[in-house]
Design a protein with these regions (language model features):
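Surface-exposed peri-terminal alpha-helical interaction modules
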Residues: 1-202
Length: 202
């Protein structure tokens, strides 16, 4: 499912770069459904009790979600950038290069802001000319742009619909992360995660 999400997000970025928002609506609707599938998979893990989990915990060794380059790609497409997160892939040339490229490229949201700037919206320069490897910092001027779009949805329909689709996938991603935390909390409490993370606090 993550491979499909990566494929779709890559396509969405290409369409925004080409000033084609309408294909993104179907693409992001599909990404949302993929996210729902991933969300529901936690239900299986939630059936594990701590005592059941500890029976095979040692088999996992140091295996961790940290090792999923596709998940990291999804995070980068969504704008959750952290250069430290790709160090684990340093010995995997193809994956590392791909993640380096995404780390230093605009996220899907960044590309949308660039699109809005190209189409005459007064997007602050610091939102479209910045270090893409850093997480996005909210700007009051961007809020005003979105207010303009939402005050006149029929005049800016494609931009309006794109905003809604981005909110959809952001919401699903937040729900997935929350369920991840609650599942970890339920099964291992506040113990160290398999990859050496601080577990729930992480």
């Amino acid at each position: 499912w993550m491979k499909l999400a990566v494929h779709e997000l890559r396509a969405a970025v290409a369409h925004v770069q080409a000033d084609e928002l309408s294909p993104c609506f179907k693409i992001l609707a599909r990404v949302k459904q993929v996210q729902r599938m991933l969300f529901e998979q936690w239900a299986v893990l939630e059936t594990l009790t701590p005592s059941e989990y500890v029976q095979f915990r040692n088999v996992l060794g140091a295996a961790s979600g940290f090792q999923s380059h596709q998940f990291r790609m999804i995070e980068f497409y969504f704008g959750n950038k952290d250069a430290r997160s790709i160090g684990v892939f340093a010995n995997h040339e193809v994956e590392y290069a791909e993640l380096q490229r995404l780390l230093n490229a605009p996220s899907l949201y960044d590309e949308f802001l660039i699109y809005l700037a190209r189409h005459g919206f007064d997007v602050p320069a610091e939102s479209v000319n910045r270090d893409w490897s850093q997480p996005y910092t909210p700007q009051p001027g961007v809020i005003q742009v979105f207010k303009q779009i939402y005050d006149n949805p029929h005049e800016h329909w494609d931009a309006y619909e794109m905003c809604e689709k981005l909110v959809d996938v952001e919401e699903q991603f937040s729900l997935w992360r929350f369920r991840h935390v609650k599942t970890v909390e339920r099964i291992i409490g506040f113990k160290t995660g398999t990859g050496g993370s601080s577990g729930v606090p992480f």
